[in-house]
């Protein structure tokens, strides 16, 4: 809504959206190894109703995000990301017909948002257009965020691709 006019920020909504989103960015393995079923230390609770460490972490991340990010920007960005489809009006292979670039497609086994199968679809469409492409799937414990964490293999892939 138009919260600017009323000077009321929809903090709970953006906080909840970030908490839900954050779960999909991380892998199940990472969440389990970091939090498991650990109960939250009473002295470091963000909210009184929080029982588990993972709840506290997500509450903290949501609170932090709600202070830094505008709710309308988040809504717009989410809609754009959700609705983008390179093959929306035609098959992906046709959408890539005019591409002159080479492709390096990197996926992570733990990524729930863009699983490796999506990368494979892009590579097949590229190959059907005689586009030089490489497709690699890496291990990463951080789900969709795996590319953000330092990885010598990931860095070497990108460096070799750019330099070749």
Regions found by a protein language model. Give the residues of each.
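Alpha/beta-hydrolase-fold enzymes
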Residues: 1-64
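Short alpha-helical scaffolding segments that buttress acidic/His motifs in well-ordered protein cores
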Residues: 20-24, 74-81
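Active-site nucleophile elbow and catalytic-triad environment of alpha/beta-hydrolase enzymes
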Residues: 60-61, 76-95
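Helix-enriched interaction subdomains in cytosolic or periplasmic regions
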Residues: 63-72
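Short, conserved loop/helix-junction motifs that constitute active-site signature segments
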Residues: 96-100, 127-129
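Short beta-strand/loop motif that positions the catalytic acidic residue
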Residues: 99, 105-107
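Conserved alpha/beta-hydrolase "acid-adjacent" motif
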Residues: 112-121
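Catalytic active-site module of serine/aspartate enzymes centered on a nucleophile-bearing elbow/loop
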Residues: 120-164
């Amino acid at each position: 809504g138009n919260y600017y006019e009323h000077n009321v920020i929809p903090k709970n909504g953006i906080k909840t959206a970030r908490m839900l989103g954050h779960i999909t960015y991380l892998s199940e393995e990472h969440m389990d190894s970091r939090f498991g079923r650990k109960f939250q230390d009473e002295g470091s609770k963000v909210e009184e109703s929080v029982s588990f460490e993972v709840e506290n972490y997500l509450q903290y991340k949501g609170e932090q995000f709600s202070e830094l990010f505008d709710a309308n920007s988040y809504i717009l960005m989410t809609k754009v990301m959700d609705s983008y489809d390179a093959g929306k009006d035609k098959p992906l292979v046709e959408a890539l017909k005019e591409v002159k670039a080479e492709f390096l497609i990197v996926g992570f086994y733990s990524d729930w948002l863009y699983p490796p199968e999506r990368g494979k679809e892009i590579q097949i469409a590229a190959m059907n257009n005689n586009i030089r492409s490489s497709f690699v799937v890496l291990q990463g414990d951080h789900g969709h965020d795996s590319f953000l964490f330092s990885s010598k293999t990931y860095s070497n892939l990108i460096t070799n691709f750019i330099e070749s």
